[in-house]
């Protein structure tokens, strides 16, 4: 409604937007993906400055406006019909202009069911990335080997923590965890920035943003039609689009739930720009730190390890 007040502060809202849209995959791919593109670029020669720029350009494409645009579109549609038309906060409500009250029938329930299935697949992919990353870290630090039982235990711990947060509710559970998550992520980002080649990382961040925005229209339609046939597009870009779409029902519903009382302008700014800005900064700083080690410090093996074992990157 017009006079609804926001339920959460702007900072907490931004933290929950960030936590909802970006999971363990932000840690998993921030180093492994740019290094993989550096060593095996979709176009041109590998392991040079052009390959580095292309790697970051592709990385930004996969984690940029396209994905957050999907989340914003779904979230805004659900919020509009839920808070303006008093419809259920469910996927089927977005079909109200097309099928009217039949959203409360078999068609509407089928849409909700498809949304649940898509979310399960998206959650499964993220859980897999997270478990591999955690197990690799435990192996590196404490010698805890990769075993099926260790991974089952990690999955159980992750699910248990998620259940506890969900039971605590949005205000006492999700909001608090999102605030902690954002603070820890910012602290880690600043540590990498200032412990590494700070000036170089800031320069590459500016250049990466410029390269991304300049090539955004052409890269959005680039299917590498004139290059030699390969499975690169399906293994990377198509995978990402499917991943963002699979997560959109869950993330869209959550964004709509926490955004009551926000204006459309606030909503668009918050969902598109706040998490997007942090994501691009994170990817640039971590990605260019790794690329710098490969190109300027002779750690070529690090690039190959991103291909052989991405979870250790």
Task: Name what the model sees in each region.
Residues 1-51, 167, 190:
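N-terminal alpha-helical transmembrane segments of multi-pass membrane transport
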Residues 5-7, 134-151, 169-183, 203-211, ...:
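Transmembrane helix-loop boundary segments of multi-pass membrane transporters
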Residues 1-7, 55-62, 77-87, 136-141, ...:
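Membrane-water interface regions at transmembrane-helix termini and the short interhelical loops
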Residues 22-26, 61-132, 140-164, 195-198:
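Helix-loop-helix module between adjacent transmembrane segments
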């Amino acid at each position: 409604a017009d006079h609804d007040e926001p339920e959460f502060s702007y900072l907490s809202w931004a933290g929950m937007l960030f936590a909802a849209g970006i999971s363990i995959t932000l840690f998993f791919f921030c180093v492994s993906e740019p290094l993989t593109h550096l060593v095996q670029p979709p176009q041109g020669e590998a392991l040079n400055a052009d390959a580095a720029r292309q790697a970051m350009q592709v990385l930004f494409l996969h984690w940029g406006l396209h994905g957050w645009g999907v989340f914003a579109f779904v979230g805004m549609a659900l919020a509009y019909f839920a808070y303006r038309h008093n419809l259920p906060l469910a996927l089927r409500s977005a079909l109200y202009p097309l099928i009217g009250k039949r959203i409360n029938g078999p068609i509407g329930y089928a849409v909700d069911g498809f949304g649940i299935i898509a979310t399960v697949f998206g959650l499964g992919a993220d859980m897999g990335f997270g478990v591999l990353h955690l197990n690799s870290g435990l192996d590196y630090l404490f010698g805890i080997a990769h075993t099926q039982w260790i991974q089952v235990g990690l999955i159980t711990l992750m699910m248990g923590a998620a259940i506890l947060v969900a039971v605590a509710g949005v205000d006492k559970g999700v909001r608090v965890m999102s605030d902690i998550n954002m603070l820890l992520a910012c602290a880690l980002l600043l540590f990498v920035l200032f412990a590494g080649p700070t000036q170089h990382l800031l320069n590459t961040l500016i250049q990466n943003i410029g390269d991304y925005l300049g090539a955004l229209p052409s890269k959005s339609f680039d299917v590498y039609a004139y290059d030699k046939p390969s499975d690169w597009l399906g293994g990377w870009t198509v995978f990402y689009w499917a991943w963002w779409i699979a997560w959109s029902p869950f993330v869209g519903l959550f964004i709509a739930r926490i955004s009551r009382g926000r204006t459309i302008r606030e909503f668009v700014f918050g969902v598109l720009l706040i998490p997007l800005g942090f994501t691009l900064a994170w990817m640039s700083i971590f990605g260019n730190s790794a690329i710098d080690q490969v190109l300027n410090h002779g750690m070529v093996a690090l690039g190959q390890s991103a291909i052989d074992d991405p979870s250790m990157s």
